């Protein structure tokens, strides 16, 4: 709430902040009230002892004081828990209760003095031990309470509180001139107050001119940021809790919407179809990513001995102590003669820690050339090393580790980059621009780079490349230093880890993408804060505080992990509150900082995100997240994402662990992901053994009206689907009625191989899925890592699940169960070395061989009735045999086996589907977009290989409505393929991290109008012999892969 006004002065504490202090004092005074009551009325005192009589009189008076304190504190607790953060009317009487409590405190002070007098007179002479101990306890307790109150008053004292109250009163009287004067006095007073706080914060440091300037700039920045802002520190804490809940609610609402392209949120960032994952299957991309991980070690080493001991608290101290030579120890040579160390401590701990860091990582080919431990405002420590393995000279700059570094961080105004030819157009963070200029000047004065490139001419150090790295403050300084050094070193590269968000202007940011690679981990706070980002954060914080109706203590308590409770009001309530309470502080939401140039993070950003499991209670063990690497947009880091990890994920060793986990997930999940992908498209997997067992199914009694083909999978859990790898393939044909003629559809289907029937039957399942259900939406963060593989298949698939036994499809199959024939192939042994194309081609040839070597009567089994073929179908076969059929083998009855494999040419349907699977899972190292993979069209050819009756109006209406009604078609799965395996950290493609199943349901690809989607698509013409076209071909829905 706004600061409470007591004694006509504003204080930096709210009336709703007194709940916990009042509860603490109430419990303390209640305890003493009980103890003193027992001592006074439960014990018998000697009437001849003067000390005992004085104790009784003093105790009775103190009982009355304790009772008054308890009543006043109960009133404070009751009032503090009323109202909301900015709804202060129920707490208006708080100041009068405080007046009463302060009066009681004065009486307590007097009684504490009396207690000290009693102790000095009777403590040694009094024989009553109980009286002495009780009096001593009361006096100590009184003085502790009095000192606590005095310290609290000093902490919450606002030097500008009197001016603030006058300014608010003058605003109400609309005196413009006096308002301007009071506002100016208020800003000056706040700047002076902030400057005093900074000096107290850095009380042990020597003040220089540059440091004094930094004090002034930062003080005015804070004064401008908090000017006219009547909130207290606890309000900011409650606002962060509310803002986090609002952000999570917005993300869930976006995922629940049907008309958007956002598929999921990873680490708070939206994942769309255009999200680009790092293609770690590409050798060049993998080398580049490993290079990023490698140079993170140099950035980590720049922090010296504090970070070394933080990473290795047990043995790190012993390893440093063995190499250290303190000023009291005899000097001994510790470094090579060519190493320069500037302003290290007497033991040389920083330089030794840097060297030990590389030795522990087995990087013995790294030589340290220069180490500067000089630390001041705008002067950041750094070191220069030569890496003979990589043939690079590395400049590593330390991040924020001292209060002086914090002053450099906070000096965030825009400053022109001192680069020739770009005066005024390239801007950067002022503190880091000055730090980069200092390092460049130091390198030139000490000729450090000349020493590094001439370190060992025999190894060719003269031709080594230059690398600049840094983390946090060092990352921003390294990026700007790269601008300054690039004219002399055109091949320079820079790796900036967790760089600040307000670093470069837009023009400079675009240019930095040529040589700067930045890394951001998860919800890191630093890459998302700059002056422009803080303005938006300030407005959001004030807005969420105004909309809240709950007491502050409930909001803060509800933020604990084990008591999740959303305190956001409902939307209807929010609108009414916003309109009725806006007058309370009309200027707060309209106040903005001085016009600041938007600044962005540098370079090409690798954003390491993770699919975090669902939060569990504090008593449950949390699952490990799965990490992925995507290419981030510099302008997307414009909002602070409130999270408990926003500070933790900025630590340098945490960033290094995140980078390494991406590689670990990739290495562990590379084989498992391909196996899982094959299980998802199991209709294309047919056992490669030459034996195919046809089993006769029970014949239906009803009239045969075949409507399609279904793949029958076991109803067990998908987790056990790969167990069937060694079983034999079994196919069953069903739907041939005894004593009846087969329809032309069944006759045509009997002449086709089972694989082609499986592929072409997908169209009917898709139509059934469109009618039966809509794909559910789900957030990524709601899925655990262990179930992400199966969620990818069973919960998210919309296309292939239709031919794998989805619940909605089973309802369709049960209605027409008597008119279907089933194929139940076993899943073959999962061999990652076999691509889907190899399996498809072999399976296609195998199925042709089985059909041609065995007549249909044998397939139906003994005792079965051979159906008569319609005259139209027989005529088509004769025409195909005469016409040659377009490139098929010369004889259908002759199939050659070469090296144990079938040598027949596969059908175009299988070839096309194989290319579709290969491009989908990137088995041939191809990269294409989702829009180029799928297209669902309605052919205009009047004939079809499978004659069907004209489509019903309802089916045609579904196809047409699907082009214009997005809600009719389930959205693509809100999951990326990288989580298909719990330990997998890779995506199936750099451009589409999604499964193919969900995308098949998208009837309107981006960039195609509904008319184009309904345009004609010619049926394939190059069919093998024996697969001719039927003259009665109708329009049907087919799937084609471009």
Curated annotation (Swiss-Prot):
Keyword Hydrolase assigned: yes
Pfam family, one: Lipase_3
Sites bearing Phosphoserine, chain numbering: 727, 729, 732, 743, 782, 784, 806, 808, 833, 847, 952
Activity profile over pH: Optimum pH is 7.0.
Protein localization: Cell membrane; Postsynaptic density membrane; Early endosome membrane; Cell projection, Dendritic spine membrane
PTM field: Phosphorylated at Ser-782 and Ser-808 by CAMK2A; phosphorylation by CAMK2A inhibits diacylglycerol lipase activity.
PANTHER family in the record: DIACYLGLYCEROL LIPASE HOMOLOG-RELATED, DIACYLGLYCEROL LIPASE-ALPHA
Name of the protein: Diacylglycerol lipase-alpha
Gene source species: Homo sapiens
Primary gene name: DAGLA
């Amino acid at each position: 709430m706004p600061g409470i006004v007591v004694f006509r002065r504003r204080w930096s504490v709210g009336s709703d902040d007194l709940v916990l202090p009042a509860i603490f004092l109430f419990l303390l005074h209640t305890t003493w009230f009980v103890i003193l009551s027992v001592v006074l009325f439960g014990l018998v005192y000697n009437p001849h002892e003067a000390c005992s009589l004085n104790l009784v009189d003093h105790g009775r008076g103190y009982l009355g004081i304790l009772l008054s304190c308890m009543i006043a504190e109960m009133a404070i607790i009751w009032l503090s828990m009323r109202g909301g953060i900015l709804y202060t009317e129920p707490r208006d009487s708080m100041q009068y209760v405080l007046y009463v409590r302060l009066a009681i405190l004065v009486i307590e002070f007097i009684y504490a003095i009396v207690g000290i007098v009693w102790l000095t007179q009777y403590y040694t002479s009094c024989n009553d031990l109980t009286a002495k101990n009780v009096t001593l306890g009361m006096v100590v307790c009184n003085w502790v309470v009095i000192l606590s109150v005095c310290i609290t008053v000093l902490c919450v004292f606002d030097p500008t509180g009197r001016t603030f109250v006058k300014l608010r009163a003058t605003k109400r009287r609309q005196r413009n001139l006096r308002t301007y004067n009071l506002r100016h006095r208020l800003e000056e007073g706040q700047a002076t107050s902030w400057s005093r706080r900074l000096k107290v914060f850095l009380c042990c440091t020597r003040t220089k001119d540059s440091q004094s300037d930094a004090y002034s700039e930062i003080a005015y920045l804070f004064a401008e940021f908090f000017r006219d802002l009547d909130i207290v520190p606890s309000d900011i804490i409650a606002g962060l809790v509310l803002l986090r809940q609002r952000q999570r609610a917005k993300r869930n609402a976006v995922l629940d919407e049907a008309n958007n392209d956002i598929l999921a949120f990873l680490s708070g960032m939206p994942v769309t179809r255009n999200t680009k994952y790092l293609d770690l299957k590409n050798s060049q991309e993998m080398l580049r990513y490993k290079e990023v991980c490698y140079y993170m070690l140099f950035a980590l080493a720049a922090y010296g001995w504090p970070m070394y001991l933080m990473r290795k608290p047990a043995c790190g101290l012993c390893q440093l102590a063995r190499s250290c030579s303190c000023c009291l120890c005899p000097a001994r040579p510790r470094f090579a003669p060519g190493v320069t160390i500037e302003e290290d401590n007497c033991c040389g701990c920083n330089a030794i820690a840097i060297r030990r860091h590389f030795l522990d990582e087995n990087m013995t080919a790294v030589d340290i050339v220069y180490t500067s431990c000089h630390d001041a405002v705008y002067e950041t420590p750094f070191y220069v090393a030569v890496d003979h393995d990589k043939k690079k000279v590395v400049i590593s700059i330390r991040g924020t580790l001292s209060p002086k570094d914090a002053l450099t961080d906070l000096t965030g105004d825009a400053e022109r980059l001192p680069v020739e030819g770009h005066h005024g157009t390239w801007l950067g963070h002022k503190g880091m621009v000055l730090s980069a200029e200092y390092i460049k000047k130091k390198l030139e004065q000490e000729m450090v780079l000349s020493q590094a490139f001439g370190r060992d001419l025999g190894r060719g150090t003269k031709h080594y490349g230059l690398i600049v790295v840094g983390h946090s403050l060092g990352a921003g300084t390294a990026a700007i230093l790269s601008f300054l050094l690039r004219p002399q070193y055109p091949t320079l590269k820079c790796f900036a880890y967790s760089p600040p968000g307000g670093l470069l202007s837009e023009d400079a940011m675009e240019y930095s993408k040529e040589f700067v690679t930045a890394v951001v981990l998860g919800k890191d706070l630093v890459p998302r804060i700059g002056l422009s980002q803080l303005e938006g954060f300030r407005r959001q914080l004030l807005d969420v505080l105004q909309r809240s109706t709950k007491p502050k203590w409930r909001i803060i308590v509800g933020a604990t992990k084990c008591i999740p409770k959303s305190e956001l009001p409902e939307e209807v309530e929010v609108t009414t509150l916003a309109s009725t309470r806006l007058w309370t502080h009309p200027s707060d939401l309209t106040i903005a900082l001085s016009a600041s140039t938007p600044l962005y993070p540098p370079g090409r950003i690798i954003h390491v995100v993770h699919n975090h499991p669902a939060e569990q209670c504090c008593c449950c063990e949390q699952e490990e997240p799965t990490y992925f690497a995507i290419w981030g947009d510099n302008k997307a880091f414009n909002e602070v994402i409130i999270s408990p990890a926003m500070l933790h994920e900025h630590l340098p060793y945490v960033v290094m662990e995140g980078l390494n986990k991406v590689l670990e997930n990739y290495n562990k999940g590379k084989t498992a992901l391909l196996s899982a992908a094959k299980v998802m498209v199991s209709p294309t997997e047919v056992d490669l053994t030459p034996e195919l067992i046809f089993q006769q199914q029970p014949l239906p009694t009803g009239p045969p009206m075949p409507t399609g083909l279904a793949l029958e999978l076991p109803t067990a859990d998908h987790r056990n689907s790969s167990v069937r790898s060694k079983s034999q393939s079994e196919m069953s044909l069903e739907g041939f009625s005894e004593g009846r003629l087969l329809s032309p559809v069944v006759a045509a289907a009997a002449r086709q191989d089972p694989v082609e029937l499986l592929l072409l039957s997908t169209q009917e399942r898709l139509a059934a899925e469109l009618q039966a259900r809509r794909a559910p939406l789900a957030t990524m963060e709601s899925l655990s890592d262990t179930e992400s593989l199966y969620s990818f298949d069973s919960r998210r698939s919309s296309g292939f699940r239709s031919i794998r036994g989805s619940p909605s499809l089973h309802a369709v199959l049960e209605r027409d169960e008597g008119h279907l024939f089933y194929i139940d192939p076993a899943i073959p042994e999962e061999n990652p070395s076999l691509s889907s194309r190899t399996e498809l081609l072999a399976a296609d040839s195998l199925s042709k061989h089985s059909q041609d070597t065995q007549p249909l009567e044998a397939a139906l089994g003994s005792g079965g009735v051979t159906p008569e073929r319609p005259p139209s179908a027989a005529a088509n076969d004769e025409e195909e045999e005469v016409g040659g059929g377009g490139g098929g083998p010369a004889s259908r009855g002759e199939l050659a086996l070469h090296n144990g494999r079938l040598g027949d040419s596969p059908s175009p349907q299988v070839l096309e589907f194989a290319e579709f699977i290969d491009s989908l899972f990137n088995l041939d190292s191809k990269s294409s977009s989702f829009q180029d993979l799928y297209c669902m069209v309605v052919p205009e050819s009047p004939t079809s290989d499978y004659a069907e009756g004209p489509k019903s109006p309802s089916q045609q209406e579904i196809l047409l409505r699907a082009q214009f009604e997005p809600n009719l078609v389930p959205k693509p799965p809100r999951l990326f393929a990288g989580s298909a395996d719990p330990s997998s950290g890779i995506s199936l493609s750099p451009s589409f991290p999604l499964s193919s199943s969900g995308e098949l349901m998208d009837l309107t690809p981006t960039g195609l109008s509904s008319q184009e989607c309904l345009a004609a698509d010619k049926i394939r013409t190059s069919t093998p012999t024996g697969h001719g076209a039927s003259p009665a071909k109708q329009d049907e829905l087919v799937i084609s892969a471009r």
